[in-house]
Amino acid sequence: MRRARALVLLTACGGAERAAAVPPWSPIPVEMPEEESAGEPGSVFRPDSPPPRVAPIVDGCPDDMVPIGGYCIDRYEAPNEKGELPLALVTAYDGEAWCTERSKRLCTQDEWVRACEGPHGRRYPYGNEHRDQVCNDDKGWILVHWKALAKWPRDPALDEATRLFQADMSGARAECVSEEGVVDLTGNVAEWVRRSTPSSRPGYDHVLKGCYWAGCYKEPHPSCEFTNAAHPGTFRTYEAGFRCCSKRASGVTSPP
């Protein structure tokens, strides 16, 4: 039985608590060889992913987004739902497609940094000094079996990603919020964003921001400034997610 179907069955049979702890892997359909299929398209979906909704507009932005200058940014990491696990194990292009389906787009690097630093240029979303356990950024690192992850979307990769997954549900840490109300910008899952300045390397149009639940590579703590530019947008890793942005309704502005 394919894992996506098993997760749906788990929820339907009353295993809601167990299902809630299952990491929400790729939101994008994946074409698989016919022999790997289980009657439905060979896809791995987040089992309870809600369909796109039409959100009421508040201050020029949908009510589940935060207005900043001329743009809106999702309050939470995708799927932008408080109390849900963030999407992970996605490429930058998965994020682009998911946001486009919802009439949004992947945030740019500059938009993400501005949302994190706030109007006063903070080093961290919540202030200028790092505070332990405010954000989900100090979990222990677990040795990764990359050969298993390379088998995505088959079960060995999903099993390995599940073993590694240590993200909190969105909004679980009440103080991990920016001055303007954007949640979980540092820690939890790393977030794909589109480069604001083009790269000279083909395929490197995206970077990862915010680090993840086990901190940063070569940096003591996840900060608004830190950028992981080491991977192309096609890179798929267990700790990478994203959030969406959109243009703010015309005629509505706030301090940049």
Question: Where do the protein language model's features map onto the residues?
Answer:
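Generic structural signal for well-ordered beta-strand positions
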Residues: A190-E191
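Short, acidic, Ser/Thr-enriched surface-loop or helix-capping motifs
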Residues: D184
